[in-house]
């Protein structure tokens, strides 16, 4: 029995290597996506976004405001425009990504204690660019306004310390936990890595099993063990090694990570068997999984918070292993969660593994029934 089981394991390994589609997906594509997908995001934050300034005041304070905006890491004042039409031309040519307008009498209104509105235009189609420009402008305007107000109070005879307390009665210190740089890569890549594991494993199983009858006996168990073992190695590469290479924050215990990852991979494997039994052709499985890729990303709760999803979608999403595995693995790897914090996810993954295994067996028996 044991010798026969190990022979089946050897057959499963050989099947992966001999099948071009499975080999390219489970070996090549996993490494390719995991290594090359992060490249555009490795700078973490936006730096030196080019903007144009229309200074209609030309005063000392307007120039100081522009200097402070330009001093921000995220923004660089690269152009000075005479009017809005010329700035708009630069914007449409993509030579700049934002326009800042300092109004006339800016300095006079500011020194008189009146509101001095500043107008900013940015590309709302790119939320990162829009947010960094708004942040740079707000910080510069706030610091300059506070400095002018403190100067006005001290000129009226108020002590400097008291004036600063009046201008800023509450000093807030923000500490970005688990993502010190506030970077986009540190936010999105840990979740994407988990989805890469899921999608390539499902596609590999689809290449190997779709349209082919089950060998029966010990073969399905041997196949499942080989797939889970192979992707357990990939989990170490993708969830431990690559975050270290890319300097992504990771403080979790590797043993706890595997306590979640192995049941997750088992559930994905069982799902792959079920999909391969329900969809008769290899091409159909691949098409189904490619179409499903983007919805799975949204259902994972990374870019679309689960609290904002319709209840129907939230319920359906629990049938996908990544829905609960992604936040659990992120909590373990990036936030240092302990085993008790993710034990519910482990039970969900085991339940999904059992449910999809039963579905795969039922689908196989249903397909064989007409020929009996």
Question: Residues of each region from the PLM?
Answer:
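Structural signal for membrane-spanning alpha-helices in multi-pass inner-membrane proteins
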Residues: 33, 37-41, 199-207, 234, ...
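Residue-level signature of the transmembrane alpha-helical core
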Residues: 27-31, 192-193, 224, 228, ...
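Hydrophobic alpha-helical transmembrane segments of multi-pass membrane transport proteins
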Residues: 35, 175-244
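Juxtamembrane loop-helix boundary motifs flanking transmembrane segments in multi-pass membrane proteins
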Residues: 1-12, 79, 164, 177, ...
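Short helix-terminus and kink motifs of transmembrane alpha helices
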Residues: 100, 135, 203-208, 269, ...
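Alpha-helical membrane-protein architecture signal
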Residues: 2, 6-10, 186, 217-225, ...
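Extracytoplasmic/periplasmic domains immediately adjacent to an N-terminal transmembrane anchor
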Residues: 1-184
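Membrane-spanning alpha-helical segments of multipass transporters and channels
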Residues: 58, 89, 240, 249-372
């Amino acid at each position: 029995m044991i010798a026969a089981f190990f022979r089946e394991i050897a057959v499963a390994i050989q099947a992966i290597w001999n099948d071009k589609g499975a080999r390219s997906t489970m070996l090549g594509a996993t490494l390719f996506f995991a290594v090359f997908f992060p490249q555009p995001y490795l700078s973490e934050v936006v730096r030196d976004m080019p903007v144009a300034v229309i200074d209609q005041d030309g005063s000392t304070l307007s120039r100081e405001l522009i200097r402070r905006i330009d001093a921000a890491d995220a923004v660089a004042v690269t152009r000075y425009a005479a009017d809005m039409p010329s700035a708009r031309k630069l914007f449409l040519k993509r030579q700049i990504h934002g326009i800042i307008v300092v109004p006339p009498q800016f300095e006079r209104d500011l020194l008189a204690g009146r509101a001095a509105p500043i107008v900013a235009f940015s590309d709302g189609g790119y939320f990162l660019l829009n947010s960094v420009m708004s942040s740079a402008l707000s910080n510069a305007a706030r610091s300059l306004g506070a400095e002018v107000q403190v100067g006005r109070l001290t000129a009226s005879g108020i002590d400097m310390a008291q004036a600063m307390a009046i201008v800023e009665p509450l000093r807030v210190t923000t500490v970005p936990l688990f993502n010190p740089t506030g970077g986009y890569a540190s936010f999105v890549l840990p979740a994407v890595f988990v989805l890469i594991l899921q999608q390539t494993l499902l596609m590999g199983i689809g290449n190997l099993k779709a349209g082919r009858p089950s060998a029966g006996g010990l073969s399905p168990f041997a196949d499942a063990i080989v797939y889970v073992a192979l992707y357990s190695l990939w989990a170490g590469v993708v969830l431990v090694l690559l975050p270290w290479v890319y300097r992504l924050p990771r403080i979790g215990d590797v043993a706890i990570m595997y306590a979640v990852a192995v049941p997750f991979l088992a559930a994905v494997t069982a799902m792959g068997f079920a999909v391969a039994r329900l969809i008769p052709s290899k091409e159909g499985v691949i098409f189904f999984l490619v179409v499903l890729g983007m919805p799975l990303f949204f259902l994972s709760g990374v870019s679309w918070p689960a609290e904002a999803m319709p209840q129907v979608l939230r319920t359906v999403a629990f049938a996908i292993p990544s829905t609960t595995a992604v936040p659990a693995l992120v909590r373990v790897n990036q936030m240092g969660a302990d085993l008790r914090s993710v034990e519910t996810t482990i039970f969900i993954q085991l339940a999904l593994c059992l449910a999809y295994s039963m579905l795969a067996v039922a689908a196989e028996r249903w397909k064989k029934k007409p020929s009996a």
